[in-house]
């Protein structure tokens, strides 16, 4: 057998998908990440205040972020199953500050003599960082989730049509690198539809359920590589189940993940009842486990 043929092999088990979740402020992006399996948030100092039970790392510099990922890579066993970066536009600012410091300027457009060289350096640093996240994912079977804010931008199609659409905040090239890297780009919004008024005077908006879109639309960007439904409820459990199904042990783990996050907002009576339920989850049917998750998720979303 030749040396080249000897290198042919088969792929290993699938790794957790890489997720880029976009949405307006307050839609529930942080809740989505906080209810992922055993998350560690990399976030700003004031991020995640509504989830005191979730572990977080609040860096002051880009060097601290890359240093943390390096230390996590060096661990033989990782306590976290998900790494959540909150948010992409905050991370971009950290990278730009690092580039400006290295270039001896306070303006990214003047870094290294200008002409886009500062942006190019920032993009190259992001590519390297995502590569390190991929190494972490491969070594520890860790899911990587990046959250991002959006804003409305005018878009002109080459064919001549023009319209407004939601786009990731920040530098377009920077966000584009994350989009290409991610397995799933999800857009979170509220599903609103029109219904006729009871008095027949016209139509009114109704609905308002929070959802995630998984496929491209003229009004927003989205994609997935897992053949997901085009629209899902905005919850970690709905996404995980659509992605690969939830095994009973995963349902129990989800309850044990979400419950500590919302326990502090419950009455003493409810806490006592839930504490008792958690003692015998192995004997509970899958349907009842999913109902329990839905109840806990609603409490989390309302906070």
PLM regions with names:
Residues 2-18, 27-29, 35-36, 40, ...:
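Interfaces that engage single-stranded nucleic acids at replication/repair/recombination sites
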Residues 21:
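Hydrophobic anchor at the beta1->P-loop junction of P-loop NTPases
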Residues 35-37, 52, 181:
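Short, structured coil segments at secondary-structure junctions
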Residues 39-41, 144, 185-187:
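Short, well-ordered beta-strand core segments
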Residues 45-49, 89-90, 150-154, 191-194, ...:
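Conserved nucleotide-binding/hydrolysis micro-motifs of P-loop NTPases
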Residues 49-116:
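Conserved nucleotide-sensing/catalytic segment adjacent to the nucleotide-binding pocket
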Residues 90-174:
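P-loop NTPase motor core
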Residues 155-253:
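Conserved GTP-binding G-domain of TRAFAC-class P-loop NTPases and closely related GTPase folds
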